[in-house]
């Protein structure tokens, strides 16, 4: 068999194309060794819209194959029923969820933080003050407080934390709110970090990592 000039060109192209395909696929192999963090930013009152945001974020994190979720949290609280739904979703989620208290995790925000597998806090931030109040700021009856106390205790137990500390956050007589240092002392904070990058760095340890932001995955339908 005598090769034509076309055959020679084709034979030469095959190893070149194979090499190009290898180079293109190389980042995919490299990415397998990366620890993937998926960041959900919750910087608002806890209500049905924030409940939908967190639920959607967890779904997107799972679709992205994330190893960890970072819940970047800054809230003074909100509706107890919405907080309970978020809490339940976090406890059900199969991969580890890291709460990053990016200034405030008050009231319902404290409950949500405690539902996460680990908690990191920013300098100057606080967690606690989970007494149930109405829209005017008046303390609700003991029936409502008892429900919140039970949720705080059970959530702390589910994530391996002291339930008495969680319950103290709902004490109407002497409500507990903690700084990062105070939270570390009682096992309610793993460390102080100034950014979500520092959080990922501490959690990943020696492994390389990448942070994916939920905002980058949001479609116009998601934002409705």
Regions found by a protein language model. Name each.
Residues 13-22:
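Sec-dependent signal peptide recognition
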Residues 21-30:
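Hydrophobic h-region of N-terminal signal peptides that target proteins for export
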Residues 30-224:
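Soluble extramembrane regions of membrane proteins in the secretory/endomembrane system
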């Amino acid at each position: 068999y005598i090769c034509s000039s076309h055959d020679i060109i084709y034979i030469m192209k095959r190893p070149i194309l194979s090499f190009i395909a290898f180079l293109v696929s190389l980042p995919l192999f490299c990415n397998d060794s990366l620890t993937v963090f998926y960041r959900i930013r919750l910087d608002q009152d806890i209500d049905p819209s924030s409940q939908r945001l967190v639920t959607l974020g967890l779904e997107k994190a799972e679709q992205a194959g994330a190893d960890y979720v970072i819940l970047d949290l800054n809230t003074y609280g909100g509706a107890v029923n919405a907080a309970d739904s978020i809490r339940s979703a976090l406890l059900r989620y199969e991969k580890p969820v890291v709460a990053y208290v990016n200034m405030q995790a008050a009231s319902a925000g404290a409950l949500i933080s405690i539902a996460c597998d680990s908690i990191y806090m920013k300098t100057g931030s606080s967690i606690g003050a989970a007494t149930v109040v109405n829209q005017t700021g008046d303390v609700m009856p003991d029936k409502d407080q008892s429900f919140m106390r039970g949720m705080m205790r059970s959530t702390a137990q589910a994530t391996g934390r002291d339930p008495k500390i969680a319950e103290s956050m709902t004490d109407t007589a002497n409500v507990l709110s903690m700084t990062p240092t105070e939270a570390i002392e009682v096992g309610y904070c793993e460390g102080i970090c100034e950014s979500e990058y520092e959080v990922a760095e501490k959690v990943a340890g020696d492994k390389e990592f990448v942070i994916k932001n939920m905002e980058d995955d949001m479609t116009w339908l998601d934002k409705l």
